Amino acid sequence: MKCVRLVKSSDLKNVEHLINNSGAGMTTMPKTSQEIKKRLIWSEKSQKKNIKKPSQDSYLFVLEDNGRIVGLSAIYTSVSLKKPSVFFKKSTSQLESKSLNFTKDLDVLSLHLCKQPYSELGTLFLKPAFRGKGRGTLLSFARFIFMSA
């Protein structure tokens, strides 16, 4: 049976095993036991809040398949509340020379800052052996259902 649920501190060993055996596929979660534990505690604290307005909360979800944790996803709220988020925006710029009859489109990356707090879908990882059959979709969409509740 498949089940998506919020993470618990007691999941530490299983979540740690999932992350540390993910190879290069898991770039959004810490690798050390101490840092993973902090993330789980942060999520549990967020779960216990009676929230009217999000304020730097984290919600980690696990996908269980027959009792084994095989996937992880997350929601982060109020990103950029205390310091701006930095991101790159891709655009296209056109160079043109009429005298040379030359036109060239160039991809340009420009640096942007976001100072408005926003919520972010983060971390989505599923063990390769469990991909397909809608499991990744379930793990991802569970976040939207949680946000709409």
Label every model-predicted segment:
Residues K104-V108, L126, R131-M147:
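Conserved acetyl-CoA-binding loop-helix of GNAT-fold acetyltransferases
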Residues T77-T123:
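Conserved acyl-donor/pantetheine-binding loop and adjacent beta-alpha core of acyl/acetyltransferases
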Residues L60-V62, R68-T77, E120:
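Conserved beta-strand in the GNAT
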Residues C3-H17, T28:
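A short beta-loop-alpha structural element at the N-terminal edge
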Residues K13, Q34-K37:
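Long, low-complexity intrinsically disordered regions in eukaryotic nuclear regulators
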Residues H17-Q34, S43-K52:
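Helix-loop element at the rim of GNAT/NAT acetyltransferase active sites that forms part
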Residues I41-F61, G71:
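A short helix-loop-beta-strand connector motif used in the catalytic cores of GNAT acetyltransferases and
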Residues V7, L124-L126:
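Hydrophobic adenine-recognition pocket in adenosine-nucleotide-binding enzymes
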